[in-house]
Amino acid sequence: MARTNTKNASVWKDGFLFVGNHLALDFLNTQPVQDGEAMELLPDFASLLGWFQTAGLLSPRDVEDLKRHWGQSAEARRTVEAMRGLRERLRKEILTWEDGGTPQYSTIDELNQLMAAYPMCARLRRRNRKQLLTELYFKRQRPEDLFAPLAQAAAMLFANANHDRVRKCDQCVLHFVDTSKKGTRRWCSMQLCGNRQKVATYAGRRRSASVER
């Protein structure tokens, strides 16, 4: 998996990758690998807020408010560490789940506790003068409130997604939900890994043809 350049810039958004087709997997993908080294895309609270904003979970005003009140706090640092810990536990569970296993009871309990402590709430608002709609939201008062959408997303992934369609890229550590009609997607994205694999396959065929001559 190569980082941003002219060819693959379209799959990066504000320094983050959104190729998972699911919020929980996009969160998992905040630690990609480049040249054999893990890249930490959530090194601090500002980066975490940036990811939430790019994912459409926080508005610019939300980000500024949280930065102003909590940016340099111990609570913000603890939240970042806790988020990264959750990410690694989910990574292990999702790898097992993709192979047909089931999440451990400890993970189920952790997600239930997070959803109870930091719930997603529903509210009614106007779509236009004649129509109403409901939308989900979460409190944005403290750093740990950010667990709300992530815990729900992980729970929804395990409960509703077809694990046969949730995969790790053949060429890197990124995960995705395969939404293709045939269910044959193998790469995180064509720009990042698909084209590279096709070039390698083509080069291999050319080498084989040269040897046979």
Region roles according to the model:
Residues 1-168, 212:
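Short helix-coil boundary/hinge micro-motifs
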Residues 166, 185, 190, 196:
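Residues immediately within or flanking Cys/His clusters that coordinate Zn2+
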Residues 168, 198-201:
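Residue-level recognition of specific faces of alpha-helices
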Residues 168-177:
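Acidic interhelical loop/turn segments
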Residues 173, 189-194, 203:
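Cys/His-coordinated zinc-binding microdomains
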Residues 178-179, 199:
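Short, non-ligating residues that shape and space the ligands of small metal-coordination modules
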Residues 203-213:
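Contiguous alpha-helical segments
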